[in-house]
Amino acid sequence: MKENWVYRRGDIYLANLGVPIGSKQGGVRPVVVLQNDVGNFYSPTITVAPLTTKIQKKRNQPTHYFLRKAKGLARSSMVLAEQLDTCDKTCVIRYLGKVSKGQMRGIDEAVKVQLGYYIPEQAEEKRQGKCRKEVNFDGG
């Protein structure tokens, strides 16, 4: 990528994530930028989620978000929000495209689940008025 390239949240790039270890995604693959645009401007790294074309495996997993094949994305893919990664900008190969605002909202929901900011079961219980009593862990 050009030295003065400006990375944006929601951009999709082809990047080299290095050697895959175990179930961790690696190699050259598409990634979506999750980091805020201020960090994208100043930092030598970007926070990304890798994409996979193996979309049938665990398709309904709450940390996955499906992206249909579109301009810049040759095949339908799954965003793997459970595999958030910090990628040095020197590992970015080329720009592929950008997700829509609606798609970014869906990806954000998957990231919230991964980081524990949103737990689907608790949200459903709250919606149905079945909230559990809060537990005080300090013995009180």
What annotation goes with each model-predicted range?
Residues M1-G140:
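Conserved functional hotspots at enzyme active or ligand-binding sites that engage polyanionic ligands
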